[in-house]
């Protein structure tokens, strides 16, 4: 469920005043994740790496309350749930968008992920949960390694967005550079940093 709230009644009141009409209110953080454990678990359990990373992203986000509030247009919207978006190549060879509702239960999330990414790939129709859930956008550039990405401010979508390329092997460990973009009205750097730390911790905890 989504509902409009008064910014003055929230901890984001001053940020709303400062950043809602800024020319570029988006901030990008870069972080290199150690994904060694995630790769080992995905291979051992025959699970998709990107599905598991999306699950960890959702799990890391629910621990930061700022993820449940998002500036939409000139309004501040409160959400009860979080979903993770993934980009799917459809049968026409083009890309479609698929939102997956976050569930704390990995098996439930996996089933939803497999069901709806296959459905979107076959139909080419986007699956949009933004009316009810705060969406975390993701994009995996699987054909190449990238160091990061900036300048993803559309002026329309204010959702947090994470992008990554191919992971890299160094010795016996695997690393994945990511870019995390967020709207400064939604959260401050400390909140973004906490999310990224949560993300690394969730990756390490996967079994």
Give each language-model segment a name:
Residues 38-63, 176-195:
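Acyl activation and transfer enzymes in specialized metabolism, enriched
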Residues 27-31, 38-44, 95-107, 187:
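Acyl-group handling in specialized metabolite and lipid biosynthesis
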Residues 130-143, 160-197:
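Histidine-centered acyl-transfer/condensation active-site motif
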Residues 2-8, 20-52, 70-84, 135-138, ...:
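Gly/Ser/Thr-rich phosphate-binding loops and adjoining beta-strand/alpha-helix segments
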Residues 147:
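Active-site cores that bind ATP or allylic diphosphates and position pyrophosphate for catalysis
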Residues 67-99, 125-128:
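Small-residue-rich loop/turn and linker elements
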Residues 1-13, 22-24, 36-37, 58, ...:
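Domain-scale detector for complete catalytic domains at protein termini or as standalone homologs
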Residues 90-144:
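Helical lid/core segments from catalytic subdomains that handle acyl or acyl-like groups
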């Amino acid at each position: 469920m989504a509902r409009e709230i008064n910014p003055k009644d929230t901890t984001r009141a001053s940020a709303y005043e400062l950043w809602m009409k800024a020319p570029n209110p988006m901030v990008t953080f870069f972080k290199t994740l150690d994904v060694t454990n995630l790769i080992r678990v995905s291979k051992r359990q025959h699970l998709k790496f990107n599905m598991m990373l999306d699950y960890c992203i959702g799990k890391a986000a629910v621990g930061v309350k700022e993820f449940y509030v998002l500036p939409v247009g000139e309004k501040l919207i409160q959400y009860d749930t979080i979903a993770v978006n993934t980009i799917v190549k459809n049968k026409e060879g083009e890309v479609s968008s698929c939102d997956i509702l976050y569930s704390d239960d990995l098996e439930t999330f996996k089933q939803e992920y497999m069901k709806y990414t296959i459905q979107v790939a076959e139909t080419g129709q986007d699956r949009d949960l933004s009316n009810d859930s705060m969406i975390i956008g993701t994009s995996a550039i699987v054909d190449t390694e990238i160091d990061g990405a900036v300048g993803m401010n559309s002026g329309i979508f204010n959702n947090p967005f994470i992008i990554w390329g191919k992971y890299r092997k160094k010795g016996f460990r695997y690393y994945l550079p990511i870019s995390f973009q967020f709207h400064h009205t939604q959260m401050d750097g400390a909140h973004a940093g906490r999310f990224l730390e949560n993300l690394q911790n969730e990756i390490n905890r996967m079994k």
